[in-house]
Amino acid sequence: SRCNYARLYLNDRYQGVYVNVERIDESFIKSRFGSPIGQLYKVEGGPASNLGYVGNDPANYRNAFEPKTDQADQGYAELIKFIGGIAPGDSTVNAQPLESMFALDDFLQTMAVMLYAGAFDQLTGWSPHNYYLYRHPKTGRWHFIPWDLDVGFADHAFGKVPVIDGWNAAWPI
C-alpha cells in the first residue's frame, strides 16, 4: 500500500509526525487488480493463519481469516481449497499446480525481503498475522498482501529476539 508522512494538528496544536497508510480495501483492490470485487481476507492470527490446512470445516478458519469483502463473507470454500492445495503432504483437496492458484513469484520476492528485514510480525514469524489474502475473481489466483510492517530492520524484534547482527535501529536512513 502507499503511505506518506503527515504532520498532525488537533485544534491547531501540533501532535507530531505520523504515517498515513493506505487501507487495504475495495479501493486498494480496484487500483491494483482492476476491479473492486473478489475475496479479501485480513489475517490476524489463530488456527490456519500460517496457511496450514485444518480441515474442511469453515469454522476452523473464521478466527484467523476475517472477510473484508462481500465475496469473502459469502463463504470459505475457495480459501479452504487454496490452503488444502498448498498444504504439505498428501492433500487430496486440490491437485492444481501452485502457480495456477497463487501469485508465487510476487510472494517469493516479498518473503525474501521480509526475511532479510527480520519482519517477524508477519507470516514469517512465530505467530503469523498482519497480512491479507486476495483472490482475483477472473484469474482465480490468490495474492499475498503484507500489512503492518513495523517490526523489521531492528536489532531485536520486540526487544528480545535478535534479528540482524550488526544492525542498529537508531541509525539514520
Give the label of every model feature segment.
Residues 1-173:
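Phosphate/dinucleotide-binding and metal-coordinating scaffold of catalytic cores
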